[in-house]
Structures are given as structure tokens and as C-alpha cells.
């Protein structure tokens, strides 16, 4: 039975980025447990899906590539692409993991975690591990919100090119909803999009709320080319039924529409459905309760990292946001372990805007 200082669950952007940062702070006894292979969720993106944040090798000027998980790497440099596919990003993660010689156990499913007096016992499908600290980096992509009996969730689509030309309904009015509408419309389909709210024209400057320029630009271009996309706002879906070869979508207003094709659900994800999250964290109404250290309120030395972290209304749903917490948490571990502070390392992360120790600084405000 292996005992390690740190166990990270999940070998995605957050898990690999955290492991690299821990090494920079002198914590090297780290393992990563991954149920599939490195970049598992990215490999399951629809083939046409791209990162909405652009990659550019701005490293060296205090602002690393927005999609980089470490200060000295850049997907733009490695792949010469600005908006990267899921498959390519997974390849980037593998390249980085190899470069930093991370200790990753693939095809290892965590089945249970129990607390002992001085450490945690992690049972998996391959072996049992002990760890003093646990970082949960499982994300939410494997837990789509599917509130209705019918509907294809965006995350379940392998390739939009497999859809025949026709009339489609998309439910959801943010990034994945508009991306689905764009992908189908550019192939000649007619799209009716229904949503209760949308970030399309939101005045909030925060890109976690407002539709990204990349999505907005693609949407505008395809509409200029004659695409037919009908947007319906303030519609809340109550139910979806299927009979007589038609999908019937009913809204809480009493209105309804029908479509011959199964509706596409761009309804987001729910990390609280993850059994690991349910076991280790207090959850209420799709919200994961965390301390100001992104630590579980149920167990000490168990942390949440990645896009699922929300703290003081700050949503860390982009890589450039959540990577800024890695060094803060690594520094916290050195303090708890009584290790000497690595001030040069801390300052280096601070200079590269990767040391977010105050969530009150996260408010996004633009005058024009």
C-alpha cells in the first residue's frame, strides 16, 4: 500500500497544473489518479468544439498563454493554433505531463475515500493509496444536466457533421447553446433556440457571464451568410415528450413547440452529481461549499481545484482563472508542513498573474 504526501484526482488541466505547481514549491511526493487517460474530458468534446479563449505565446511578459497550465508552456507555441480542439488540448496536457515527469496512474477509478487519524485512504479499482492531502480535479464535464426524459446533451455529441440538414431546437442560451446553433446552421439547418436567459447582450464584462467574442463573431458571420437562427429568450422548458414521431417541448408559460429531431440540451453541468464530490464536500442546490482556501468544510486538507470552484461570487470557469489558485494552495501546503517559504517562487507566480490570494480582486469592470 502506497503512502504519498498529495493525491490529485483527475489528470485534466487543473490536476496536471496543480502537480506542476506543487513541484515548484518543493512538494514532489505527488500522484495523480485518472479514471481514463490524460485529458479524458477534452478527448470527449465534440470534434468541432474549440477553446473560446485564444492561445497566444505571450509568456515572458507577465501574462502566460491564457490556456497554459504552467508559466513556461504555451499551447499556441506547441501547436501553432489559436483556438484549440479538445483532442489537441489533451495532447498538450500529455506533452506537459511528460516534460515535468508527473506521476500519473491512468485507468484508475477512485471508488471510496475514508478518513483515518493522520491520513486519507483512497480505494481504487487497481490499488489502495494513502495520502495526507487530496485535491479534487474531476471537473464537471462527465456530469451533464439532463432534466428531461428526452434531449441530446451537448457533451454527448461526437460530431455535428453527423446531423442531417433539417429543423432543430436548441435549449440553452450561452456558449454551448450558441456553438450548437452555429455548427448546425453552417450546415444549412434551421435553428430555433430557446432559453430563459442569455449572455449574448449581457452588460456584465465578466466573460464568465457575457458571451465570448469568439462565439459572437462566428454567430454573426454565419447569420450574414444567410443562416436561419431564431432566438427566443425568457422561455423556461417544463418538459419534453415524444409521440407520433415528434418531440413536444412545453414551457412553463403554457406554450409549446414541436420538432422532428431530438432537441439539443445546452443546459450545463452539475459537479454535485459526482459521487466523490458528494462524499467529500457539503453540497446544496448544485453548490459546493468551500472555505476561503477552496477547502472542504467537511474534511481538512481536501481541496477543490479547477473550473468548478466558486468563491465570493468569483467563478473560476476558465483556465486562466483557476490556474491562479494553484500557487496559493501550494504555498498553503508548505506552511502546514512547516517547509521553508520559497519567496522567489511566490514572486515569480505573482509576476505572471498566477497567484490569486484575494477573491475580492476578481471583479471585472470595463469602461469601454
From Swiss-Prot:
Molecular function per GO: flavin adenine dinucleotide binding; monooxygenase activity
Keyword hit for DNA-binding: no
Pfam families reported in the protein's UniProt record: Pyr_redox_3
Entry annotated with the keyword Flavoprotein: yes
Enzyme Commission number(s) from the entry: 1.-.-.-
Function, as annotated: FAD-binding protein that may have monooxygenase activity using NADPH and/or NADH as an electron donor.
PANTHER family in UniProt: FLAVIN-BINDING MONOOXYGENASE-LIKE PROTEIN (AFU_ORTHOLOGUE AFUA_4G09220), NAD(P)-BINDING DOMAIN-CONTAINING PROTEIN
Name by which UniProt lists this protein: Putative flavoprotein monooxygenase
Amino acid at each position: 500500500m502506497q503512502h504519498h504526501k498529495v493525491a490529485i484526482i483527475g489528470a485534466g488541466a487543473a490536476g496536471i497544473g496543480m502537480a506542476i505547481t506543487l513541484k515548484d514549491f518543493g512538494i514532489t511526493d505527488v500522484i495523480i489518479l485518472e479514471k481514463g487517460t490524460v485529458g479524458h474530458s477534452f478527448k470527449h468534446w465534440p470534434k468541432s468544439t474549440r477553446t473560446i479563449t485564444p492561445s497566444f505565446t505571450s509568456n515572458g511578459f507577465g501574462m502566460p498563454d491564457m490556456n497554459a497550465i504552467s508559466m513556461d508552456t504555451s499551447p499556441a507555441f506547441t501547436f501553432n493554433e489559436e483556438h484549440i480542439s479538445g483532442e489537441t488540448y489533451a495532447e498538450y496536457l500529455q506533452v506537459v505531463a511528460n516534460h515535468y515527469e508527473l506521476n500519473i496512474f491512468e485507468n484508475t477509478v477512485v471508488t471510496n475515500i475514508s478518513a483515518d487519524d493522520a491520513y486519507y485512504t483512497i480505494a481504487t479499482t487497481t490499488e489502495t493509496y494513502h495520502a495526507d492531502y487530496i485535491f479534487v480535479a474531476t471537473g464537471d464535464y462527465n456530469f451533464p444536466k439532463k432534466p428531461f426524459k428526452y434531449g441530446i446533451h451537448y457533451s454527448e455529441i461526437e460530431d455535428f457533421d453527423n446531423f442531417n440538414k433539417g429543423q432543430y431546437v436548441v435549449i440553452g442560451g450561452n456558449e454551448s447553446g450558441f456553438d450548437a446553433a452555429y455548427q448546425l446552421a453552417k450546415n444549412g439547418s434551421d435553428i430555433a433556440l430557446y432559453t430563459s436567459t442569455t449572455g449574448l447582450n449581457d452588460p456584465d464584462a465578466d466573460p464568465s457571464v457575457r458571451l465570448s467574442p469568439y462565439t459572437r463573431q462566428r454567430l454573426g458571420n454565419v447569420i450574414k451568410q444567410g443562416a436561419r437562427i431564431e432566438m427566443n429568450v425568457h422561455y423556461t422548458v417544463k418538459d419534453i415528450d415524444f409521440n407520433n414521431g415528434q418531440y413536444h417541448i412545453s414551457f412553463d408559460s403554457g406554450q409549446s413547440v414541436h420538432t422532428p429531431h431530438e432537441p439539443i440540451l445546452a443546459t450545463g453541468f452539475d459537479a454535485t452529481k459526482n459521487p466523490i464530490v458528494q462524499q467529500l464536500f457539503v453540497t446544496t442546490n448544485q453548490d459546493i461549499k468551500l472555505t476561503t482556501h477552496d477547502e472542504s468544510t467537511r474534511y481538512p486538507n481536501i481541496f477543490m481545484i479547477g473550473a468548478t470552484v466558486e468563491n465570493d461570487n468569483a467563478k473560476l470557469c476558465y483556465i486562466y482563472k483557476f490556474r491562479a489558485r494553484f500557487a496559493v494552495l501550494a504555498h498553503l501546503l508548505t506552511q502546514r508542513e512547516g517547509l521553508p517559504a520559497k519567496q522567489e517562487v511566490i514572486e515569480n507566480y505573482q509576476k505572471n498573474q498566477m497567484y490569486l490570494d484575494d477573491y475580492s480582486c476578481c471583479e471585472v469592470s470595463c469602461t469601454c
